[in-house]
Amino acid sequence: VASPFGSNRGTPVVTELARALPKSLGLLGVSLLLAVAAGLFLGVQAAVRRHSRVSGLLLFASAFGISTPSFFAAMLLIWLGVWLYARTGQHLFPVAGFGWDAHLLLPALVLAARPAAAVTRLSYNALLEIMDADYVRTARSKGLRPRVILMEHVLRNAGVPILTTVVVSLRFSLAILPIVEYIFSWPGIGQALLTAIQIQDTEAVVGMILPLALLFVVVNLVAELLYLQLDPRLQDARAGAA
């Protein structure tokens, strides 16, 4: 039986994975942090300021982010980086290559754009539904500060739908990772996978796909464990079964 971890252009696939996988995980991690932080912040702002121009603008931006293809967003950011270089003579936003500094910014923004927009939209909807709940009105009538109500009653109960959006967004980021890495020449597992497909290296393709599939499994497993912690209904069901 042949091992799926053969050779990629004379280099063992395991060696290629050891080189490329940390770069892909780093890019995914930074993009996920950007997406969750920006999405939650913008979603909270849109919900707190509902019926205002700020809320309408944020919702329009989130709809635009969801509907914009990632490769088109990548092309726009590359154009911006080239334009800034032509104007300033400095590589403020490098459009290709590897580095844990400015090189990371553009691919991370492309990976984070659509997930951030999705988190913004769903967190806005979830927060609005909870803010109109009876227990939130009771908390207001007791004179609790808006910040306390938001943190203790609203955000805590919006955790499950927001987590669902984050998980779906992370799956989407994993799916488009090879394209983004290839566009920005980021030397991660996605770029190595597309290169192996181009040269028809079957062993390398299989060896590159397996870690990506394993990442999907790990994401789903972690999500299920978090659901058990965040959803009281699942905790009660587990306690009843015991």
Identify the role of each PLM range.
Residues L17, L21-V54, S70, A96-A242:
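Alpha-helical transmembrane segments of integral membrane proteins
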Residues P4-N8, Y85-A96, A239:
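Short helix-coil transition/hinge motifs at the ends and kinks of transmembrane helices
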Residues G56-L58:
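Cytosolic-side membrane-entry/anchor segment at the start of a transmembrane helix
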Residues V1-T15:
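Short membrane-interfacial helix/loop motifs at transmembrane-helix boundaries
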Residues F60-H91, V110-A116, R121:
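Membrane-water interface segments at the C-terminal ends of transmembrane alpha-helices
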